[in-house]
Amino acid sequence: MTSAALAPSSAAPAGAGAAPRSRAAVRRWLFAMAALVIAMVAVGGATRLTGSGLSITEWKPVTGAIPPLSAEAWTEEFAKYRATPQYDILNRGMSLAEFQVIYAWEWGHRFLGRLIGFAFFLPLGWFWWTGRLDRRLGLGLLGLGVLGGLQGAVGWIMVASGLQPGMTAVAPIKLAAHLTLASAIFAGLVWLAAGLDRAPDEPLPRRLRLTALALPLLMLVQIALGGLVAGSKAGLTYNTWPLMDGAFIPPLSGLFAVTPWIENFVDNVALVQLNHRLAAYGLLAVAALHWLDLFRTRPGSRAAKRAGAILGLVTAQAALGITTLLLAVPLWAGLAHQVTAMLVLGMAAVHARIATLSRA
């Protein structure tokens, strides 16, 4: 989807005299959708951290909305799971009651995805039918809806990778793709909502607008790298900071031990974790420099205050990441780290969108 498609038009909606109310309603709906996506990411993170993601072995977009309702149905679902490599290698001897717990996490994650689909497309159709969306905004929203449908397919491709012979978890690259696409959809929702009927701030020079735009892009890259850390379980190794096995950067022989060399970026836990660390340092530096630039050139402005909030969130996220690493990824810390990443991305997207409206 192009940035032009995502950019809200300044043209008034078709409904005469309804622009303020309809735009406000659309904005509230978009922020509500963004909140649902955060909830989806949180439940997905809990599903992964509890080892529940492979408990449902089939993809049934319609009939799968109904969980097992009888003892016979539960026995059938459990039999399907017992045929998976994860059960055979990791969970042999699991009871039906234990299976029902992990099944509930994965079913809840999928059900929330279906709920988000209804919560998106039904209001979208209503707003469009009643003339409350101009063409550009409507097409941008439709594009996000298509990405949401694609996200469901990517989720199943990810799960299917973990059901292959010898696999006990999903492929890291596919988990990273699933998380990054969800994050991009979230950023798109926030971007659109932040630009609706908003009066421009004090004009910003091109330098500040570009650094504002860089922040959500860097955060998306960092989320993708975090997805690789989660998928490869790299957070369970090198549980020290700031050093990794006694060095700020481990020896290259260890970082590129896998052949071919390109696979180290996905399969070598040392390089995967190092990349996530270095990207975090880079993001923190850009956020700090951007705030300092605004503090010096636009002191007291709304842009400077937003940049300060972003810097605070990035700092908190870095502290959470370090805590999560030192504690070897407890459930609460892993979830807090994942949710805070979405908050950083959301704030950065709002700031970047407003900055693009504030041309000098």
Swiss-Prot record:
One of its GO terms (biological process) is heme A biosynthetic process. The chain crosses the membrane at residues 29-49, 111-131, 139-159, 175-195, 210-230, 242-262, 269-289, 309-329, 330-350. Catalyzes the conversion of heme O to heme A by two successive hydroxylations of the methyl group at C8. The first hydroxylation forms heme I, the second hydroxylation results in an unstable dihydroxymethyl group, which spontaneously dehydrates, resulting in the formyl group of heme A. Belongs to the COX15/CtaA family. Type 2 subfamily. It catalyses: Fe(II)-heme o + 2 A + H2O = Fe(II)-heme a + 2 AH2. Heme binds at residues 276, 337. The keyword Nucleotidyltransferase does not apply. It comes from Methylobacterium nodulans (strain LMG 21967 / CNCM I-2342 / ORS 2060). Disulfide bonds: none annotated. One of its GO terms (cellular component) is plasma membrane. Pathway: Porphyrin-containing compound metabolism; heme A biosynthesis; heme A from heme O: step 1/1. Its EC number is 1.17.99.9. InterPro entries: COX15/CtaA_fam (IPR003780), HemeA_Synthase_type2 (IPR023754). The keyword Membrane applies. It comes from the Bacteria. The lineage of its organism: Bacteria, Pseudomonadati, Pseudomonadota, Alphaproteobacteria, Hyphomicrobiales. Its cofactor is heme b. It is an enzyme of class 1 (oxidoreductase). It is a multi-pass membrane protein. Keywords: Cell membrane, Heme biosynthesis, Iron, Membrane, Metal-binding, Oxidoreductase, Transmembrane, Transmembrane helix. Interacts with CtaB. This is Heme A synthase. Signal peptide: none annotated. It is found in: Cell membrane. GO terms for molecular function: metal ion binding; oxidoreductase activity, acting on NAD(P)H, heme protein as acceptor.
